[in-house]
A protein has these predicted regions:
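C-terminal amphipathic alpha-helix
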Residues: 25-68, 104-157
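Short, solvent-exposed, charged loop/turn and helix-capping segments
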Residues: 78-102, 156-157
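A short glycine-/small-residue-rich loop at the edge of a beta-strand within enzyme catalytic domains
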Residues: 65, 69-72, 89-92
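Hydrophobic membrane-insertion alpha-helices, especially the h-region
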Residues: 1-16
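Helix-turn-helix repeat elements of alpha-solenoid scaffolds
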Residues: 73-77
Length: 157
């Protein structure tokens, strides 16, 4: 199911990339609430999906290489969401909420990158103590992302 969601999101994003773009093109948003809600929904799906895949890898149900492939796709999608937020040019009343959500996405992307580090450490049979340090950092990044999501929600007009 996770793979299906990731493929659907990836496919949809390619339509954006295949559309001819000029250098002065901008992403116009008129309903900032709906736009942020959509990004939040995609972010949640990606974060949940990658967490499930990460647990599968830690449990030995999937290989680190398979996990890395899924995580890189998810990270790319998070980057796409970051670009959408930046290019949306939120109105003054929505700016604080958008900036906090932007930080939540960045924390999630950092989290995904750290999970890739763990996958590579597992492939290389790294010392468990070193893996545990990175796992601790991953937990901190998850909490950081949640904190920014809460701040974004609180800052909504």
């Amino acid at each position: 199911m996770t793979i299906v969601i990731l493929v659907a999101i990836t496919t949809a994003s390619f339509f954006v990339w295949l559309t001819p773009q000029s250098y002065d093109a901008t992403f116009v948003v008129s309903d900032f609430k709906s736009h942020l809600d959509e990004i939040k929904e995609i972010h949640g799906a990606l974060a949940d999906g990658i967490e499930k895949e990460f647990q599968k890898m830690l449990n030995g149900d999937i290989t680190p290489d398979h996990y890395i492939e899924v995580a890189e796709i998810s990270s790319s999608q998070i980057n796409s969401q970051i670009i959408q937020l930046v290019e949306s040019k939120a109105s003054q009343e929505w700016q604080e909420s958008y900036l906090n959500y932007l930080e939540a996405l960045r924390a999630t992307n950092s989290n995904m990158r750290e999970t890739i580090v763990v996958a590579n450490m597992i492939k290389e049979n790294a010392d468990k103590q070193n893996v545990d340090k990175v796992l601790k950092k991953i937990d901190q990044l998850k909490e950081e992302s949640k904190s920014f999501v809460s701040a974004s929600d609180s800052a909504r007009p």
